[in-house]
């Protein structure tokens, strides 16, 4: 069984909207609903959870309860890592635990359903898989505003979501890193820290994360191109 965890627990202050950015609409549909729809349509996903800020549980449920694969809203923590951990612990208490879990940022509404399926297929083969975009620009390592060295860009990938993992291994990885969760920037880094192998699945560039207000202007362009 494969569960998706859609992380929608942020308040989205950087985006400058009056409401959290996952509830901002593109063409009369919220970002959250757009993302949830992708997992509803994936043949590889059996069920999904949504992690929500405690102040927006009702609004979150209203947006996703229309989907047959939706199971529950889990209250998030003080940061993304704690929010995912809460969802993993919820799943860990179930009698029928998932075999794999697919974790996605709600504010990446343009993820391709085929890429979701591809990441799950690769995770079943390796143990973990991350959608990622190969770097095209020159990448430098910097110290105090000065370039230390130029990195080999053919070996650099920019992580996206979803990120898919063997559920038991990911839960163990989170438990192992419980006291230092805030030092990690994504689920793959926690999984790798525990010593587990993780593969890259090359992703499309338009699977952008909507973080700032200008990202939403780009999102409108992507939406129009895809329509």
UniProtKB/Swiss-Prot annotation:
Pathway the protein acts in: Isoprenoid biosynthesis; isopentenyl diphosphate biosynthesis via DXP pathway; isopentenyl diphosphate from 1-deoxy-D-xylulose 5-phosphate: step 2/6
GO molecular function: 2-C-methyl-D-erythritol 4-phosphate cytidylyltransferase activity
EC number: 2.7.7.60
Entry annotated with the keyword Nucleotidyltransferase: yes
Top-rank EC class of the record's enzyme: transferase
Entry keyword set: Isoprene biosynthesis, Nucleotidyltransferase, Transferase
Enzymatic reactions: 2-C-methyl-D-erythritol 4-phosphate + CTP + H(+) = 4-CDP-2-C-methyl-D-erythritol + diphosphate
PROSITE patterns cross-referenced by the UniProt entry: ISPD
Site (Positions MEP for the nucleophilic attack): 153, 209
Biological processes per GO annotation: isopentenyl diphosphate biosynthetic process, methylerythritol 4-phosphate pathway
Transition state stabilizer (site feature) positions: 14, 21
Pfam families assigned: IspD
Similarity section: Belongs to the IspD/TarI cytidylyltransferase family. IspD subfamily.
Annotated function: Catalyzes the formation of 4-diphosphocytidyl-2-C-methyl-D-erythritol from CTP and 2-C-methyl-D-erythritol 4-phosphate (MEP).
Annotated protein name in UniProt: 2-C-methyl-D-erythritol 4-phosphate cytidylyltransferase
């Amino acid at each position: 069984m494969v569960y998706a965890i859609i992380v929608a627990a942020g308040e989205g202050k950087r985006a400058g909207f009056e409401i959290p950015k996952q509830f901002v609409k593109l063409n009369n549909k919220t970002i959250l609903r757009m993302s949830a729809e992708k997992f509803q349509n994936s043949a590889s996903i059996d069920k999904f959870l949504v992690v929500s800020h405690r102040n927006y549980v009702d609004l979150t449920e209203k947006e996703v309860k229309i989907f047959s694969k939706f199971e529950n809203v889990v209250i998030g923590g003080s940061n993304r890592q704690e929010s995912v951990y809460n969802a993993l612990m919820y799943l860990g208490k179930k009698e029928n635990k998932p075999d794999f879990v697919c974790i996605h940022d709600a504010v990446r509404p343009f993820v391709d359903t085929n890429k979701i399926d591809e990441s799950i297929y690769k995770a079943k083969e390796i143990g973990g898989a991350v959608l990622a975009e190969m770097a095209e620009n020159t990448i430098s390592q910097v110290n105090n505003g000065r370039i230390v060295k130029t990195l080999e860009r053919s070996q650099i990938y920019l992580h996206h979501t979803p990120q898919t993992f063997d559920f038991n291994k990911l839960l163990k990885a989170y438990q192992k890193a419980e006291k230092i969760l805030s030092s990690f920037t994504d689920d793959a880094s926690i999984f790798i820290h525990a010593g587990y192998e993780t593969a890259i699945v090359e992703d499309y560039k338009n699977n952008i994360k909507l973080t700032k207000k200008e990202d939403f202007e780009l999102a409108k362009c992507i939406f129009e191109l895809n329509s």
